[in-house]
UniProtKB/Swiss-Prot annotation:
SMART domains: LysM (SM00257), TLDc (SM00584). It comes from Bos taurus (Bovine). Residues 98-141 form the LysM domain. Residues 711-872 form the TLDc domain. One of its GO terms (biological process) is response to oxidative stress. Residues 1-86, 150-187, 314-338 are annotated as: Disordered. CDD domains: LysM (cd00118). This is Oxidation resistance protein 1. Keywords: Mitochondrion, Phosphoprotein, Stress response. The modification Phosphothreonine is found at residues 118, 341. Residues 549-576 are annotated as: Mediates oxidative antimutator activity. Pfam families: LysM, TLD. Residues 212-268 form the GRAM domain.
Length: 872
């Protein structure tokens, strides 16, 4: 008893560590098989107890392994890796993309620019969580050689169509009607079915909605002096940007810096779409392929008209040659078909009526009415025959076709657009001839044994025959008589065969009578038609030419902005300086936009209109928005505005610009009304009285204090110059720091007098022709390795009238000081103003920096006197 209790206690207290590295529950089972062959050994109580413990530990090894698998806590790293690998395997390559490996100096923006796309699109294609990329990373980028198919998703981007999931593909397979329906699933098959793997699509609905928030348009940027380049216009709710194509010849010649521009949307004052460009300077730089129709298209148009007339001539000639055989055969075949009931004919009647209405729209009134009368009467005759022959069983059993097929075959001549093999017509005709006993009457009919559809010539010939029939009314009367006979045949079914025979003879005799007349008239009709078509082709050619000129492939978008657009391929400082240089110019930018994208632009600007948000409050929102300008709001006082309004298709303006135009329009209308009523306003009185006072005040305010009297400038010339000086010079006295009368003619002396000076300087030159001109420098003159200065620099001349030429923004060539020369402006190897080391010889030429003409009378001049003034 004690031994048994002891063994039970040992069994209860003993445990096995299943997590131990040396534990193997199957090891005992594996060793148990070879031990069974050994002879049994004498058992002691201790050995028996150990064997019982081993047997208990081996009873449920599978259960313990399952518990270990489901309840063991691990780190989860392997599971996470497997899940990531599965997701990576299920991510499909988007259509229209290629793999690109990120290089050391690449960024997401540079990659997007390299493949003509946007960074947002790359983020969407590759499912990126940030814009950071690392070297060696593989990205999917748009394939430039990919052509999107019709089945691709209609998104703005030609790439990244939606890829269907595998479950959707399975659903499409099961719902396809052509596939045999599978058997009903059994309960066991429901558990054995493999669960479909979820495939990550290339885009989602949210991302598609995001891509619709901007427009990406391939267009051309038209400049006044730098030509026309092709590129991409990107319009977003915040910015408008144009990126030129690197492959454009002008871009390769001048660089991207000249054509890449960007502007915030809040700076846009108006956006208008024009049919043509009104600015003469812009219009001169417009390429020929955009401005007018090329001569190659006109020659192609002539070839098309000639080919059309030749084709028409051949068709009519072939129809005239075959008129004798085609007309009887077609009419015979149309009546030698199996008969059918009126209920089966009703859908064919409806189809015939609709086709006759369509033909009535295409052809003239008289000819279409005759064709319609003949075809409808023919249908009535067929209906009578079918009703008369519907009772006998041997007639019903003689048909080898369905009702729809027979209806299509019998209406071949009336519809003029269906194709019918002659073999089927022969079978139907033979069946009807066997039934009615009319074989001997049809021996003279010629029929072919080959299967061929009705060609275009025969269809055209049949249509000409029907239009040229002079006895349509007689045919209608004869067919009415046949209709009356058919009504009597309803009561007497045995007379149906006789009526079929009479109707066959009627059509055959009529067609034979018409053959001679048609042969004679076909030649006249063909000649008249050829002459008419040639004249029509010439008229259509000229009309098409005018129509193509009026509706060109391109229309012109004009953007007017408050400040000049910033260059995107230059540094921030250079872009700011260029904006400052163009501050006094008219800020208009022209783009040649494809005609099909004009509506997209209009809809985009209308989408950001503030009207929907301002209706309830009655106040205009501060958010940037646009308002459509109506033509009745435009001023029509002068001819220029009328021409502009006629050429403009639509225009949207900002809220501020809209109110400014309304105020200006109201003010102008009020002034016009006052002039018409001869009413003097207070503004007119004040303007008349204060004109001399204001002139005196302006002259006093702009007249500076000079340290020394000037020998080169007159007082009025000083005032004119002062108005164009930068604001930082206003209020400072003019100090003479160098003059040839005081310091001599030496460039080195000039540099020495400028030492330690930190103000702008004004150089005035008088040449041997007594002409005064000069330059304003933003910094004192000095010896430099390259050009220096900023956009405040300009050149001027009083020869013959006062003109100022400020920085154009084309380049940064302002001032260049050498030991033997001093130059202003540059570009193309020419300087706006150049002086030698002795300050005796000089040269002036037009340059790109200032856009000036020659400042002196002659390009080469001799210096008579020089004055340099500083502002301190």
């Amino acid at each position: 008893m004690s031994v048994t209790n002891l063994s039970w206690l040992k069994k209860k207290s003993q445990s096995v560590d299943i997590t131990a590295p040396g534990f193997n529950p199957l090891a005992g089972a594996g060793k148990q098989m070879p031990q069974a062959s050994k002879p049994p050994a004498p058992k002691t109580p201790i050995i028996e107890e150990e064997q019982n413990n081993a047997a208990n530990s081996q009873k449920h090894p599978s259960r313990r392994s399952e518990l270990k698998r489901f309840y063991t806590i691990d780190t989860g790293q392997k599971k996470t890796l497997d899940k990531k690998d599965g997701r990576r395997m299920s991510f499909q390559k988007p259509k229209g993309t290629v793999k690109y490996t990120v290089e050391s100096r690449d960024s997401l923006n540079s990659i997007a620019l390299k493949f003509d796309t946007t960074p947002n699109e790359l983020v969407q294609l590759n499912k990126l969580f940030s814009r950071a990329v690392v070297t060696g990373q593989v990205l999917y980028v748009p394939d430039p050689e990919y052509v999107s198919s019709v089945e691709s998703s209609p998104s703005l981007s030609p790439i990244s169509p939606l890829s269907p999931t595998s479950s959707e593909a399975e659903l499409e397979k099961t719902t396809t009607p052509d596939v045999v329906h599978p058997k009903e699933p059994t309960p066991s098959s429901a558990f054995t079915a493999v669960r479909p793997v979820r495939v990550v699509s290339s885009t989602s609905e949210e991302e598609e909605a995001f891509t619709e928030k901007f427009l990406k348009i391939n267009c051309r940027y038209i400049t006044s002096s730098k030509g026309t380049v092709s590129g991409v216009l990107l319009v977003t709710p915040n910015n408008i940007m144009f990126d030129p194509h690197k492959t454009d010849p002008l871009v390769q010649e001048n660089g991207c810096e000249e054509y890449g521009i960007m502007c915030p949307m809040e700076e846009v004052m108006s956006a208008a779409m024009y049919k043509e460009i009104l600015d003469s300077k812009i219009k001169e730089s417009l390429p020929i392929e955009i401005d007018q129709l090329s001569g190659r298209d006109f020659c192609h148009l002539k070839k098309v008209t000639r080919s059309n007339t030749d084709e028409l001539d051949s068709r009519i000639r072939d129809a005239a040659n075959d008129s004798a055989s085609t007309a009887p055969r077609s009419t015979e075949e149309s009546l030698s078909e199996d008969v059918f009931t009126e209920s089966e004919l009703s859908p064919v009647r409806e189809e015939l009526i609709s086709l006759d209405e369509l033909r009535h729209d295409k052809s003239s009134g008289a000819s279409s009415e005759s064709v319609q009368t003949i075809t409808q009467s023919g249908v009535e005759c067929l209906a009578v025959i079918s009703e008369a022959a519907s009772t006998p069983d041997h007639l019903k059993s003689g048909s080898g076709h369905t009702a729809n097929e027979v209806g299509t075959l019998s209406l071949k001549t009336g519809l003029n657009n269906l194709e019918m093999p002659t073999k089927e017509g022969d079978q139907a005709a033979d069946n009807l001839q066997k039934i009615s006993g009319l074989k001997e009457q049809s021996t003279g009919i010629k029929k072919d044994n080959q299967d061929f559809p009705l060609d275009e010539n025969s269809l055209h010939q049949e249509e000409v025959e029907k239009e040229s029939m002079p006895c349509g009314e007689a045919i209608e009367l004869k067919q009415k008589q046949v209709v009356d006979k058919g009504k009597q045949g309803r009561e007497q079914n045995q007379d149906s065969e006789t009526e079929v025979e009479e109707l066959r003879k009627l059509w055959k005799s009529h067609s034979m009578q018409q053959t001679k007349q048609q042969r004679e008239t076909m030649q006249q009709v063909s000649q008249k038609e050829i002459k008419h078509k040639i004249a029509t082709a010439d008229i259509e050619g000229s009309a098409l030419l005018k129509e193509k000129r009026r509706h060109r492939l391109h229309k012109f978008l004009c953007l007017r902005v408050r400040k000049p657009m910033r260059k995107t391929f230059v540094s921030q400082a250079s872009a700011t300086m260029q904006q400052y240089a163009q501050r006094d110019k008219k800020h208009e930018y022209w783009f040649a936009v494809p005609q099909e994208r004009t509506d997209h632009l209009y809809a985009f600007f209308i989408q950001w209109s503030p009207e929907t948000y301002a209706e309830d409050t009655g106040e205009y929102t501060k958010e940037p928005g646009f308002i459509v300008v109506k033509k009745i709001e435009e001023s029509e006082t002068n001819e220029d505005s009328t021409n502009e309004a006629a050429a403009r298709e639509w225009e949207v303006v900002s809220v501020a610009e809209y109110h400014r135009r309304i105020d200006a329009l109201n003010t102008e209308e009020l002034r016009t009304l006052c002039r018409r009523l001869q009413i003097t306003t207070r503004e007119d009185i004040n303007s008349k009285q204060s004109t001399p006072v204001k002139a005196d005040l302006e002259s006093e305010s702009f007249r500076p204090n000079l340290s020394d009297p000037s020998h080169l400038l007159l007082p009025d010339q000083i005032i004119k110059l002062t108005k164009h000086l930068p604001p930082r010079t206003i209020g400072y006295p003019w100090t003479l720091v160098y003059g040839t009368r005081k310091h001599g003619t030496s460039l080195k002396t000039l540099y020495r007098t400028m030492t330690g000076l930190d103000t702008p300087v004004l150089m005035v030159i008088k040449d041997s022709d007594w002409q005064v001109f000069g330059a304003f420098a933003s910094q004192p003159f000095k010896v430099s390795d390259g050009f220096y200065g900023n956009g405040e620099t300009f050149v001027f001349t009083f020869c013959p009238e006062f003109e100022v030429f400020k920085w154009t923004g084309d380049n940064m060539f302002f001032i260049k000081g050498d030991m033997d020369s001093l130059a202003f402006g540059g570009g193309g190897g020419e300087f706006a103003l150049w002086l030698d080391g002795d300050l005796y010889h000089g040269r002036s030429h037009s340059c790109k920096t200032f856009g000036n003409h020659t400042l002196s009378k002659k390009e080469d001049f001799c210096i008579q006197d020089i004055e340099i003034w500083a502002f301190k």
